[in-house]
Amino acid sequence: AADRALAERRPAVRVDVAAELLGRLHAVDRAEDVPELAALAADQAALLRERAQRFAGPLGADPGLLADAAALLDELPRGGRRALLHGDLNPGNVLADDDGAGRRRWRAIDPKPVLGDTAFDAWPVLAQVGNPFAEEDPVGVLRAHARVLCATAGLETDRVAAWALARSCESALWRAAELGDRDAALADLAQARAWARLA
């Protein structure tokens, strides 16, 4: 039977589990009828630029940070190791199955599959395991978790941080445009600034 036991574990254990799971998931490097990350990221970059013109001022956002995020969305899909990605590997999408012999096997659910740079998949796990942005040193926590995840899953820390910066900015402007949620948008922008210190 599946359970949500991952949410009950310490952040370091949760990062280890996610890293091992990403390593297994990324073993597949091709699939039919799966969208390309490059196309998704290009659409997100265009939308980010349009939304930045409307919301950077009202949010007090750094236009340079938003421009960097859009440029990263254009550039990052051209590099990195290519594989089939989960697309939304957040802690709520990681479940444990008992194999009947008392062993637990972790699995991912609710994928939003795309083909592209494996570093793309790390952001939801790193941003949502524990509460790194509420820590006294969020950059230190992110750095430590990213090192563990990248070492186990075979990812490049700088690429993971760059994707996280870009996706945090995209998320911030989505929250502003689609939800009208200024506080959540500002929180995402603060997270993007933390990721910028790692990228």
Predicted regions and their residues:
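ATP-binding pocket architecture of kinase catalytic cores
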Residues: 1-34
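Active-site Asp-x-Gly
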Residues: 96-147, 154, 184
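Short acidic/histidine-centered micro-motifs embedded in hydrophobic/aromatic stretches
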Residues: 43, 125, 163-167
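An alpha-helical support segment within catalytic cores of ATP-dependent transferases
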Residues: 11, 27-87, 97-103, 151
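Helix-rich C-terminal or lid/interface subdomains of diverse kinases
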Residues: 130-199
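Short, well-ordered beta-to-alpha junction loops that form the rim of enzyme active sites
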Residues: 87-89, 165
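Soluble or luminal CAZymes and related metallo-dependent hydrolases
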Residues: 13-17, 64-65, 141-145
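Hydrophobic residue at the +6 position relative to the catalytic HRD Asp in the kinase catalytic loop
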Residues: 92-94
